[in-house]
């Protein structure tokens, strides 16, 4: 099973051109002196964030990206042409690390954000620069500097407002397809979703939010079981988590409470800050529960789970309860938007060292997650 959110690429900046050791030779100018030009600079490699790109799939196949070398200098004070820069377009939310040093180079959080990832080499100096009062005909010149060469690890973190959390087959894909424009693959078996699906939920004119259908979790995900960390990392930038629970599993031996506790346990083992994020409980598949049993089954689940936060009862298949949930999410996001942006800014300031671009344990007891 492939999870298209990681790629490894090599970026190679261009070498600088060599300087020229040349003498001016013209009729009637017997001692023309040096006229060797400088070499051109090597091309650099930049990355730029593009909100119209959703995956890193292109970089799983195109793994080497090279900028052009600078041209050598020539006589008659001719400077070499600089190598052309290249720009790699990547999704907003991509994190770029140097694989050799572990340095965090960039976290692309804004559309059109531009970051230098490999700097081209400087051009060499021609002998024109070495002329002095004691050396009128210098033969010295310098070679161009090599461009930077790096192995980069690209990692995509979904920049969504809301993340869907739950066991495989909890109905997350059905829910996101019913409330948004996303069209994820849906089937009656676990692990239908192998890559995150993003959907834009439109509440009204100018009112919308992004929801991420993250692949289902299994117990042991924090240690890498199933698709492991690849699931959990996508939830780190969301402002709100929806914990979807299948209230009517096909297998009667499955206990929804035990599954819900397992999910929360994995969340806490992976990242305490992720566990502390605002989280709402969404009880799904009510259409599969007889009407005369619904109230009792919901009450029993909440009591056994020890949940005191917001609860929503829905059927993603029929749409029952989805509209009220969507409006509640939108109202919450509007109310807490400033706090979420501040959290992202603080996170960015703590761990990102941008390079300048020219111009540019156990079974947890639940708490009231909606009070954040």
From Swiss-Prot:
Its cofactor is Mg(2+). Coiled coil: none annotated. It is found in: Cytoplasm. Its EC number is 3.6.5.-. GTP binds at residues 166-173, 191-195, 213-216, 284-287, 315-317. The keyword Nucleotide-binding applies. Keywords: Cytoplasm, GTP-binding, Hydrolase, Magnesium, Metal-binding, Nucleotide-binding. SUPFAM superfamilies: Obg GTP-binding protein N-terminal domain, P-loop containing nucleoside triphosphate hydrolases. GO terms for cellular component: cytoplasm. Residues 1-159 form the Obg domain. An essential GTPase which binds GTP, GDP and possibly (p)ppGpp with moderate affinity, with high nucleotide exchange rates and a fairly low GTP hydrolysis rate. Plays a role in control of the cell cycle, stress response, ribosome biogenesis and in those bacteria that undergo differentiation, in morphogenesis control. This is GTPase Obg. It comes from Burkholderia pseudomallei (strain 668). The lineage of its organism: Bacteria, Pseudomonadati, Pseudomonadota, Betaproteobacteria, Burkholderiales.
């Amino acid at each position: 099973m492939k999870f298209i959110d990681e790629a490894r690429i090599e970026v190679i900046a261009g070498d600088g051109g060599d300087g020229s050791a040349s003498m001016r030779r013209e009729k009637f100018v017997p001692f023309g002196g040096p006229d060797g030009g400088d070499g051109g600079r090597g091309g650099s490699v930049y990355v730029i964030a593009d909100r119209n790109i959703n995956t890193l799939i292109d970089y799983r196949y195109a793994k080497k990206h090279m900028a052009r070398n600078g041209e050598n200098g020539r006589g008659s004070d001719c400077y070499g042409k600089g190598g052309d820069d290249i720009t790699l377009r990547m999704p907003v939310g991509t994190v770029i690390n140097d694989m050799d040093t572990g340095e965090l180079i960039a976290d692309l959080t804004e559309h059109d954000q531009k970051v230098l990832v490999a700097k081209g080499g400087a051009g060499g100096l021609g002998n024109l620069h070495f002329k002095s009062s004691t050396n009128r005909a210098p033969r010295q010149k310098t070679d161009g500097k090599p461009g930077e060469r790096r192995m980069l690890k690209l990692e995509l973190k979904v920049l969504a407002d809301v993340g869907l959390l739950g066991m495989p087959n909890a109905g997350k894909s059905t829910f996101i397809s019913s409330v948004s424009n996303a069209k994820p693959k849906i089937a009656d078996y676990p692990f239908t979703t192998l890559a995150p699906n993003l959907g834009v939920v439109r509440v009204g004119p100018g009112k919308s939010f992004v929801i991420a259908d993250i692949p289902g979790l299994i117990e042991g995900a924090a240690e890498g079981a199933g698709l492991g960390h690849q699931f959990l990392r996508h939830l780190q930038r969301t402002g709100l988590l929806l914990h979807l629970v299948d209230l009517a599993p096909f297998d009667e031996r499955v206990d929804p409470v035990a599954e819900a506790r397992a999910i929360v346990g994995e969340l806490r083992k992976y990242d305490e800050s992720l566990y502390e994020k605002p989280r709402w409980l969404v009880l799904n598949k009510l259409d599969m529960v007889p009407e005369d049993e619904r109230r009792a089954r919901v009450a029993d689940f909440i009591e056994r789970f020890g949940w005191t936060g917001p609860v929503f009862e829905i059927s993603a298949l029929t749409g029952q309860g989805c509209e009220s949930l969507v409006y509640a999410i939108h109202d919450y996001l509007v109310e807490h938007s400033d706090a979420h942006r501040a959290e992202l800014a603080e996170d960015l300031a703590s761990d990102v060292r941008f390079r300048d671009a020219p111009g540019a344990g156990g079974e947890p007891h639940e708490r009231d997650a909606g009070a954040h």
